[in-house]
């Protein structure tokens, strides 16, 4: 049985990847901030999906990841699709700082936790969603571009 954990599965690419993996017979653990959205997706494939409310910006997120891995019975693939980005023409500091917290701090926290899990277990796969903005840059969203560059490095 193949097992994947998807962080950021409450919408967008993460949600769609979850649906595709379910169709392919994977057992998945899904995590995100919106528990109602997690439960809605879980209801589409009873017995195939475990859920965990998790915010990558919280220091306890790696512990919650390990909880989800235990619920699932292991992890073969870690898929990170959490991230934020906003246009910020006035360079409001809070927008830039929130983007950095999620896309750098949260990214680092979760990928490091997944890496350490796989290192201890003898292997696995890590996949993350980034953006062309990390190589091309978007002047209207400076923190988004910078954080995606960080993820691409």
Segment roles from a protein language model:
Residues 10-11:
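Conserved glycine-rich cofactor-binding loop
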Residues 45-60:
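Rossmann-fold cofactor-recognition segment
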Residues 81-87:
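Conserved NAD(P)H cofactor-binding loop of Rossmann-fold oxidoreductase domains
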Residues 89-101:
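Short alpha-helical oligomerization interface
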Residues 111, 147:
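Active-site helix of classical SDR
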Residues 131:
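Residue(s) in the substrate-gating loop at a strand-loop-helix junction
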Residues 136-142:
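Active-site loop immediately N-terminal to the catalytic Tyr-X3-Lys motif
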């Amino acid at each position: 049985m193949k097992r994947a954990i998807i962080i950021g599965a409450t919408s967008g690419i993460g949600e769609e990847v979850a649906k595709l993996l379910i169709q392919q017979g994977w057992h998945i653990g899904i995590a995100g901030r919106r528990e109602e959205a997690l439960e809605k997706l879980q209801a589409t494939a009873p017995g195939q999906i475990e859920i965990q409310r998790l915010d990558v910006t919280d220091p306890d997120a790696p512990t919650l990841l390990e909880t989800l891995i235990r619920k699932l019975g292991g992890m073969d693939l870690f898929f990170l699709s959490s991230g934020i980005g906003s246009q910020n023409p006035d360079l409001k500091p809070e927008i830039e700082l929130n983007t950095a917290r999620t896309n750098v701090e949260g990214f680092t926290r979760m990928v490091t936790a997944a890496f350490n899990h796989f290192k201890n277990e003898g292997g696995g796969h890590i996949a993350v969603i980034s953006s062309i903005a990390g190589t091309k840059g978007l002047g209207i969203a400076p923190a988004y571009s910078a954080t995606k560059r960080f993820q691409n490095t």
